[in-house]
Amino acid sequence: MRLYGAIGPRVDGDYFAQELASLDRGDFDMIHIRMNSPGGNVFQGMSIVSAILSMNTPVCVHIDGIAASMAAVVAVAADRVCMMDFAKMMIHDPYFTGESGKATSPKQKKALARLTDMLRQVLVRRGKDEATMAKLMREETWFSAAEALDAGLCDEITSSARNEFMNLDPMQLCLLYTSDAA
């Protein structure tokens, strides 16, 4: 499966959850989700999180570029998270869309506090303790793949075969081509 783009109208949480459920009825050892998303709607995203957490088949999310905001929460709900070596992950406290993004009424502040707690509960399942995660969310923290690995937010850093090929020194390249010709 692929989760590319913003979670919301483009990546509908209900539809995505239904697709996951149909794959869960299949004969798969693992379900792989490729991700490159700036995040999006918390309510749509939590539909995907709930679907991932209720799967019988293990789920692996591969972060191909960015997993920011709600997409990061979706990613860490998986059984396994792999990030490309150049990929980034970002977590932050939720906010209202609009002019200021800030909660103004006591009711809005209470709602945002509850949403923040809900998202943090998913993140702490595999990362830092609750107090540390709250601080990282409040500060809007960006992680490189190595930093996400250190924080427990991903399990593996991957690189493409092309990157590995480009990193070979000239002697290794010569040996590679001469051994194929023999």
Where are these regions (language model features)?
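N-terminal organellar transit peptides
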Residues: M1-M70, A77-A182
